[in-house]
From Swiss-Prot:
<dbReference type="GO" id="GO:0008270">
    <property type="term" value="F:zinc ion binding"/>
</dbReference>
<dbReference type="InterPro" id="IPR020058">
    <property type="entry name" value="Glu/Gln-tRNA-synth_Ib_cat-dom"/>
</dbReference>
<keyword id="KW-0436">Ligase</keyword>
<feature type="region of interest" description="Disordered">
    <location>
        <begin position="1"/>
        <end position="36"/>
    </location>
</feature>
<keyword id="KW-0547">Nucleotide-binding</keyword>
<comment type="function">
    <text>Catalyzes the tRNA-independent activation of glutamate in presence of ATP and the subsequent transfer of glutamate onto a tRNA(Asp). Glutamate is transferred on the 2-amino-5-(4,5-dihydroxy-2-cyclopenten-1-yl) moiety of the queuosine in the wobble position of the QUC anticodon.</text>
</comment>
<dbReference type="GO" id="GO:0006424">
    <property type="term" value="P:glutamyl-tRNA aminoacylation"/>
</dbReference>
<feature type="binding site">
    <location>
        <position position="257"/>
    </location>
    <ligand>
        <name>ATP</name>
    </ligand>
</feature>
<feature type="binding site">
    <location>
        <position position="127"/>
    </location>
    <ligand>
        <name>Zn(2+)</name>
    </ligand>
</feature>
<comment type="similarity">
    <text>Belongs to the class-I aminoacyl-tRNA synthetase family. GluQ subfamily.</text>
</comment>
<feature type="binding site">
    <location>
        <position position="141"/>
    </location>
    <ligand>
        <name>Zn(2+)</name>
    </ligand>
</feature>
<keyword id="KW-0030">Aminoacyl-tRNA synthetase</keyword>
<feature type="binding site">
    <location>
        <position position="145"/>
    </location>
    <ligand>
        <name>Zn(2+)</name>
    </ligand>
</feature>
<feature type="short sequence motif" description="'HIGH' region">
    <location>
        <begin position="38"/>
        <end position="48"/>
    </location>
</feature>
<keyword id="KW-0067">ATP-binding</keyword>
<feature type="compositionally biased region" description="Polar residues">
    <location>
        <begin position="1"/>
        <end position="30"/>
    </location>
</feature>
<feature type="binding site">
    <location>
        <position position="216"/>
    </location>
    <ligand>
        <name>L-glutamate</name>
    </ligand>
</feature>
């Protein structure tokens, strides 16, 4: 989860200055476009269903599009077959997307073009600093290589930060303030091993797809500061943001593939969807057992409200964990 020292909620929920109003001051498109962008490092689990369902319901409640993108830019972390199982799970749970699925592994040319543009504008540079050096500095890069004019060989590429984002507005959490060191940091946009950085690929693809609002888990609050800065330096409209509470395991840790969260079951999707709606504190139909999947989701769309969503994460219901584990063999 995001450390309080890095990102903090404002005690005053009003925006204090233009820096925190950056998303809302951008263009206001007529069409809502949301998205769900999982990485194929494992199967979907209850925690990722929360993010998928929340983004889906928000998009459909606005009468907008809901896109799906597979973020497969880190081959060492990918699990064979996970991408197709993720898509199958979304369909099984009734979360049908609009348009074709985009795979980041097929978008390298766009990322290279963006890197070239940033270089031509003097907005990037090569860096050879190691993780251990940055760790010794307290975790934030200090700009050591900024004016060293290093060659490309064996170096990462960093964004030359010109528009630091000290605060941004989240529709659920209100005004969020970033640690100045995080806001001012020249972050990596291409890794030393040649792989494109997550923040670069996300911004390039969201801009390409015309995404107007990003609904995702609260574990991604910290990268939002960097992504908004990159949007601005690339002169792209900045989307609005909603960061949902995280589903936690019994130890209080985020449900994740790294923490061995069980995959979603292949049985009747409605009980798990009901658990997800309860987690988000959404209104439920009185006799949901009598509704088919389509009608259940339609009810959820028609009654979707951000006001009810809790601000903090919560332990996943035991029955949900047991149900997922008992159905593991079906996946």
């Amino acid at each position: 989860m995001v450390q309080q020292a890095v990102i903090q909620r404002s005690a005053n929920q009003q925006l204090s200055n233009q820096r925190s109003a950056n998303q809302r001051a951008t263009n206001q498109p007529t069409e809502y476009v949301g998205r769900f962008a999982p990485s194929p490092s494992g199967d979907l689990h209850f925690g990722s269903l929360i993010a998928a369902l929340g983004s889906y319901l928000q998009a459909r409640a606005q009468g907008g599009k809901w896109l799906v993108r597979i973020e497969d830019i880190d081959p060492p972390r990918e699990v064979p077959g996970a991408a197709s199982r993720i898509l199958a799970a979304l369909e099984h749970y009734g979360l049908h997307w609009d348009g074709p699925v985009i795979y980041q592994s097929q978008r390298h040319e766009a990322y290279r073009a963006t890197l070239n543009w940033l270089e031509q504008q003097g907005l990037s540079y090569y860096c050879t600093c190691t993780r251990s050096r940055i760790h010794q500095l307290g975790g934030f890069y200090d700009g050591y290589c900024r004016d060293r004019h290093l060659p490309a060989s064996g170096a990462a590429i960093r964004l030359r930060q010109t528009q630091p984002v000290y605060a941004f507005y989240d529709k659920l959490l209100g005004e969020l303030h970033a640690h100045p060191a995080l806001a001012q940091e020249d972050f990596i946009i291409r890794r030393r091993d040649g792989l494109f950085a997550y923040n670069l690929a996300v911004v390039v693809d969201d801009a390409f797809q015309g995404v107007t609002e990003i609904v995702r888990g609260a574990d991604l609050i910290e990268p939002t500061v960097r992504q908004i800065a990159l949007y601005q330096q690339l002169q792209h409209p900045v989307p609005s943001y909603i960061h949902l509470p995280l589903a936690l395991n019994n130890q209080g840790n985020k449900l994740s593939k790294q923490n061995h969260a069980p995959p979603l079951p292949n049985g009747d999707p409605r009980p798990i969807l009901i658990d997800a709606l309860k987690f988000l504190r959404q209104p439920l139909p009185e006799y949901w057992q009598d509704l088919d999947l389509y009608l259940l989701l339609r009810y959820a769309v028609e009654h979707w409200t951000l006001v009810s969503i809790p601000l903090q994460g919560a332990i996943t219901p035991q029955k949900t964990q047991r149900h997922s584990q008992s159905k593991h063999g079906e996946l």
